[in-house]
């Protein structure tokens, strides 16, 4: 293109002038500097600890030269491979995944992005660019292709100005969005990833960002394009083709199931790479930080083979038996000790675990965590809606707890416990349960979930009834469930009572027999 020709000639001229102005001694000194052997450093890193390899029963992952690396299963968030996943490292152009995600969320694909002089000339000379001139404009869709396929830095800057108003304000948006995704090891200072000491991330954080990015099919399609033809318009007069340097995307390395990815490189970060692939319904995200070319691609292939070959993704509701998740409503809240105003709970159907193929689901460690404040808020809101005659929950499903699964101490997935929001039976029971009462305040209602019970100002008899109600209760589908610890306690108490009764009756029988014997002796003496 003409603009490239002009810039090329200008670059040569500037380089010649700079060279002619530099003292010879400086150049001589630079040539004598000892060069860093990055490949030797990468080779040494292959002996570093791989944290996931220390998990008991976990498949042993490969030794790679990357400083930081992670393999994450997208649906469950399970980390299958971990090497320094929380270490602060420089991301380079994989930063653009976050910029692209924000653009997709904040802008319309048809919006126009006009490029200012600041956007065009703020980037480093010689860095990735498509040669946009100040005043020209692209659609957001074209900009995203330029961002992800050609890694165009001036396009990243233009998108940042479009969203944030200026390059200085946009990093606040980046850091806020990263935090919302659960990132705790990152700090972003620019939209493109050009080097800044305060611009860093971790393998784990980049996996979280990529996980969200590749959850959007349109974004995944853009990031999986080997080429893109940029059409001319009245705002951008040139036609040209963009080429993707990601070898698993452009076909240089063939690999089944690639969904997209992003390359990155600056001198201080070395090679960085993010890639997403899916096979048999299992989506894996691989992040490589600080590696040497072409091993960032070789590492990725090796980790994908490791993940797809050794792990399986399981839907929790297909395997969980301990919490009777196959039956909806395995938990409930009661308006009173008689069970009136029962409110159904269920377990989310979109929860997954990802575990080694050699480990059975039944062997996993599970832990139920409740949000007590949220549960009580749900009860109060629901009862108030029921008493007002509403039969539909205003806010739909509400998460009031979570079941966490792990292999030892290593998390492998979770699922939410939901309040279903079905008030059809609540309204009827509420009317019956509050008839004749002076107050309908929900604050005094007992709350039951799991093995935790709450009640206020109840009589001893009421307490006994409430205890029995807690042991035997039914789900929304009518299935009966037992609280095993409480049932065992009840059996012990019942056994003790039975023993006492037997002893008492035995003693009474002994006394009666003794009286009979005395009467017989007296009667016999009289007869004699």
Residue locations for each model-derived region?
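C-terminal segment of classical bacterial N-terminal signal peptides
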Residues: 18-27
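Cytoplasmic C-terminal tails of single-pass
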Residues: 511-528
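Domain-terminus/edge residues, biased toward the C-terminal soluble/receptor-binding domains
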Residues: 183-184, 197-200, 204-205, 210-490
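Substrate-recognition/cap regions that form aromatic- and gly/pro-loop-enriched pockets
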Residues: 486-500
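Alpha-helical transmembrane segments
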Residues: 496-513
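Active-site-adjacent loops and short helices of periplasmic peptidoglycan-processing enzymes
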Residues: 27-204, 208-222, 279
């Amino acid at each position: 293109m003409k603009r490239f020709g002009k810039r090329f000639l200008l670059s040569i001229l500037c380089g010649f002038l700079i060279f002619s102005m530099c003292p010879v001694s400086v150049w001589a000194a630079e040539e004598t500097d000892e060069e860093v052997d990055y490949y030797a450093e990468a080779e040494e890193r292959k002996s570093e600890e791989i944290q996931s390899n220390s998990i008991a029963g976990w498949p042993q992952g490969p030794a790679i030269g990357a400083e930081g690396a992670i393999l994450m299963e997208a649906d469950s968030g399970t980390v299958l491979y971990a090497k320094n996943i929380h270490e602060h490292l420089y991301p380079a152009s994989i930063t653009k995944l976050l910029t692209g995600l924000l653009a997709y969320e904040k802008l319309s694909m048809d919006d126009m992005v006009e490029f200012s002089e600041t956007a065009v000339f703020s980037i480093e000379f010689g860095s990735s660019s498509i040669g946009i001139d100040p005043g020209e404009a692209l659609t957001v869709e074209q900009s995203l292709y330029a961002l992800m396929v050609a890694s165009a830095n001036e396009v990243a800057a233009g998108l940042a100005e479009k969203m944030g108003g200026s390059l200085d304000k946009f990093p606040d948006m980046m850091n806020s969005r990263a935090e919302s995704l659960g990132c705790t090891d990152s700090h972003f200072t620019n939209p493109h990833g050009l080097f800044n000491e305060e611009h860093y991330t971790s393998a784990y954080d980049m996996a979280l960002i990529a996980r969200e990015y590749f959850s959007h099919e349109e974004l995944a399609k853009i990031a999986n394009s080997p080429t893109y033809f940029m059409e001319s318009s009245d705002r951008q007069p040139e036609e040209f083709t963009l080429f993707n340097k990601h070898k698993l995307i452009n076909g240089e390395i063939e690999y089944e199931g690639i969904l997209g990815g992003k390359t990155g490189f600056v001198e201080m970060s070395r090679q960085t790479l993010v890639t997403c692939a899916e096979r048999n319904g299992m989506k894996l995200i691989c992040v490589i930080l600080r590696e040497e070319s072409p091993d960032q691609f070789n590492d990725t292939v090796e980790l994908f083979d490791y993940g797809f070959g050794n792990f399986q993704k399981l839907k929790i509701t297909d395997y969980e038996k301990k919490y009777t998740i196959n039956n909806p409503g395995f938990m409930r809240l009661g308006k009173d000790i008689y069970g009136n105003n029962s409110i159904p709970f269920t377990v989310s159907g979109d929860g997954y675990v990802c575990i080694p193929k050699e480990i059975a689901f039944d062997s996993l460690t599970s832990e139920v965590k409740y949000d007590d404040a949220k549960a009580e808020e749900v009860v109060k809101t629901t009862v108030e809606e029921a008493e007002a005659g509403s039969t539909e929950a205003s806010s739909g499903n509400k998460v009031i707890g979570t079941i966490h699964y792990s292999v030892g101490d290593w998390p492998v997935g979770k699922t939410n416990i939901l309040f279903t929001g079905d008030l059809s039976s609540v309204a009827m029971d509420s009317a019956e349960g509050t008839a004749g009462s002076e107050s309908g305040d929900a604050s005094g209602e007992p709350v039951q979930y799991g093995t935790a019970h709450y009640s206020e100002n109840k009589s001893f008899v009421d307490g006994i009834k409430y205890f029995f109600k807690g042991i035997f209760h039914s789900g929304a589908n009518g299935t009966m469930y037992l609280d095993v610890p409480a049932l065992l306690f009840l059996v012990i108490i019942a056994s003790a009572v039975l023993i006492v009764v037997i002893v008492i009756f035995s003693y009474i029988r002994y006394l009666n027999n003794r009286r009979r014997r005395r009467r017989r002796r007296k009667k016999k003496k009289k007869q004699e």
